[in-house]
């Protein structure tokens, strides 16, 4: 729980998502921890000013490790949406995306990639079922399954932007909008200790299937007010691991 001391024999994860360029105005301050996880939508539109402001704020936080993935609002991070309305070539568009990603200097950015922090294996991916013309959209079914099949089976903490179906995904339109394929991969193959996500602001909170704890860490509510508190959890420090690396 918030306020509990950080233990020497555990890795403290602090989870946020969907801060939408309001991370400096969060109603609940971000507590210290070993690892800060941001599950995407750290901007409103993904422009460079927003990215720079977010990166600068991350630099003020004390966490030794900061891991960030993109969400559907990071339009400049996806070559498909970065090209909307532009006449650039594919190569030029890809270079523009690479340049904006390099502006995140105070964190580890994961896009279909893994990182090991304090001996704990983390995997991050930004994709979600198609939603209007936002970034990192894929059709439900095989296209998304292909992405989730890249998740290593030894993942301890999975970070995606979309929720899996049935966990933190209940929308104000009275329906579950999470990803079926993601739930199947999480429950039947990967079985991580924790699955952290956001995207559905009204789905904030934690659930469990008895094996994995599902964490919707969306900070903003449906009116984009940064009212929710960060969610923290501790993972036992793996044998032989150190918090110094």
Predicted regions and their residues:
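Binuclear metal-dependent phosphoesterase catalytic core
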Residues: 116-118, 181-194, 201-245
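A Trp-anchored, charged/polar loop motif used as the substrate-binding/catalytic surface
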Residues: 104-110, 137-149
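Beta-strand-turn-beta hairpins that frame and shape the catalytic cleft
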Residues: 4-13, 114-124, 153-157, 207-213, ...
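Short catalytic/ligand-binding loop motif for oxyanion handling, primarily in non-cytosolic enzymes
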Residues: 76-79, 117-118, 130-132, 166-168, ...
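Active-site neighborhood of phospho(di)ester-bond hydrolases with catalytic His/Asp-centered motifs
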Residues: 15-17, 36-41, 65-72, 110-111, ...
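Acidic, histidine-bearing metal-coordination/catalytic regions of metal-dependent phosphoesterases
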Residues: 1-25, 61, 80, 234-245
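Active-site-proximal segments of metal-dependent phosphoesterases and phosphodiesterases across multiple
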Residues: 82-91, 131-135, 153-191
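Core catalytic region of metal-dependent phosphoesterases/phosphodiesterases
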Residues: 16, 21-117
């Amino acid at each position: 729980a918030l306020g509990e001391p950080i233990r020497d024999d555990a890795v403290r994860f602090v989870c946020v998502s969907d801060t939408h360029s309001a991370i400096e105005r969060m109603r609940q301050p971000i507590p210290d921890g070993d690892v800060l996880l941001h599950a995407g939508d750290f901007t409103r539109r993904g422009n460079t000013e927003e990215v720079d402001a977010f990166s600068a704020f991350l630099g003020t936080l004390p966490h030794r490790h900061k891991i960030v993935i993109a969400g559907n609002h990071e339009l400049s991070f996806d070559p498909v949406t970065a090209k909307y309305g532009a006449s650039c070539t594919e190569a030029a568009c890809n270079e523009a995306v690479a340049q904006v990603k390099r502006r995140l200097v105070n964190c580890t950015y994961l896009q279909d990639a893994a990182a090991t922090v304090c001996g704990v294996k983390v995997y991050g991916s930004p994709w979600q079922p198609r939603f209007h013309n936002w970034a990192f959209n894929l059709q439900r079914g095989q296209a998304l399954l292909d992405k989730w099949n890249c998740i290593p089976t030894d993942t301890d903490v999975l970070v995606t932007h979309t929720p899996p179906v049935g966990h933190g995904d209940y929308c104000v339109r009275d329906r579950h909008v999470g990803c079926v394929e993601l739930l199947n991969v999480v429950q039947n193959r990967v079985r991580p200790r924790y699955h952290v996500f956001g995207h559905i602001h009204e789905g904030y909170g934690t659930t469990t299937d008895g094996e994995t704890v599902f964490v919707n860490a969306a900070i903003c509510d449906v009116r984009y007010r940064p009212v929710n508190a960060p969610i923290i959890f501790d993972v036992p420090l793996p044998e032989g691991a150190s918090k110094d690396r």
